[in-house]
Amino acid sequence: PDLADMFADPYPAGPVVAPAPNADPGRYRTAVFFDAVYGDCRKGEVEKHLVAVPWVPKHGGGTVRFSPRAGAAEALAAVSRELDAGPAEWRKYLVPASGTYNCRVIAGTDRVSAHGWGIAVDIATRATDYWYWSDPKGRNVVFRNRIPPEIGAVFERHGFVWGARWYHYDTMHFEYRPEILGLTRRK
């Protein structure tokens, strides 16, 4: 994908609803752009800059490693503080965090995952829904989401897109994409 592809599907505001077929707002990434901003993990340019971000410390979440570039770590810290102040029943979705930095490609592709730039966090492994588990060929994807939309809204307020907004959904996945959400907020 190129830069125009990244903005092809407008990121929705408001309630979480089943996305239109093949609408994946914020899921497309241009590696050249992200390598320039965050570094290329395959060349060792990301890991050496990662910082420890406290993750919902009142709930015993420990720390997670995240990129400090472009305000990503600051944004995640703000998410953490807001989630920490949320209802106690959110804890089961937040602790433990299921993963942040991991220099890897997206399954079945040669494209680097957002985790490889240190800008993605996965939560709630036990309560996650993922399109591939329901329809590996992607022909009859049935939308499912068990993560409270209020949790997703916290991330979105701080510049993260949520995989529950994608037709090819990945409800545990949040990635720092201020370029996508900044455009959405201006409309």
Please tell me what each predicted stretch does.
Residues V161-K187:
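A cross-kingdom marker for long, charged
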Residues P1-W166:
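Cell-envelope/glycan interface and biosynthesis
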